[in-house]
Amino acid sequence: MTDTSLQAALRAEHLSKVYDEGPARIQVLDDVSLTVARGEMVAIVGASGSGKSTLLHILGLLDVPTSGSLVVDGTATEGLSEARKSAVRNRSLGFVYQFHHLLPEFSALDNVAMPLIVRRMDRDQARLQAREVLGLVGLAAREGHYPGQLSGGERQRVALARALVTRPACVLADEPTGNLDRQTAQNMFELLSRVNRESGTAFAIVTHDPELAARADRQLHMANGRLLPG
């Protein structure tokens, strides 16, 4: 089902996630509601184990909540088959992680083009679109280099380009600067901010870094499975 009146990139309402481990009942998310508007950058901060990554996995349709509802780019996700979830994820979401997960045997250009090739786009057209996005992240001159020939910051920029190449409504980023030194991390966050402004893509970013989070449009704090204003 698609709600054409919904203008949010993501809308989650009353999400909970509970794990039953023998007699123990572990509540990881507790009545979490979150809306990410189109073009908005939202930062989610909190200690390890507070539920941030679990929330991001649910928002990314990589996990299911125990209760609650999620609408991604106008599509209600409750009850969708795995194939349909995959289609929504591939159409509307991009992902950036702390580790870049680039394929070492492919060039930067082909790593970025891969999501389009998987969609059966013509290879030349996929490379053309990938080349445009590499230019957006400042790596046009490095398109022929392999991951092992790139710096840590460059590899993360390639990963960002790969997340953007399908033109998603929202990019979900889990500690995207966590594996970078301070200066490179600041450069990466400035790039995220610029791409957010120029492309209109929404971002939901999980980070431990309050200084970086403060640059987002809105900052939220996760504690004990609950989401609070920053």
Swiss-Prot record:
GO terms for biological process: lipoprotein localization to outer membrane; protein localization to outer membrane. The complex is composed of two ATP-binding proteins (LolD) and two transmembrane proteins (LolC and LolE). One of its GO terms (molecular function) is ATP binding. Its EC number is 7.6.2.-. The keyword Acyltransferase does not apply. It is found in: Cell inner membrane. Belongs to the ABC transporter superfamily. Lipoprotein translocase (TC 3.A.1.125) family. Part of the ABC transporter complex LolCDE involved in the translocation of mature outer membrane-directed lipoproteins, from the inner membrane to the periplasmic chaperone, LolA. Responsible for the formation of the LolA-lipoprotein complex in an ATP-dependent manner. GO terms for cellular component: plasma membrane. Keywords: ATP-binding, Cell inner membrane, Cell membrane, Membrane, Nucleotide-binding, Translocase, Transport. This is Lipoprotein-releasing system ATP-binding protein LolD. It comes from the Bacteria. Pfam families: ABC_tran. ATP binds at residues 46-53. Residues 10-228 form the ABC transporter domain. SMART domains: AAA. It is a peripheral membrane protein.
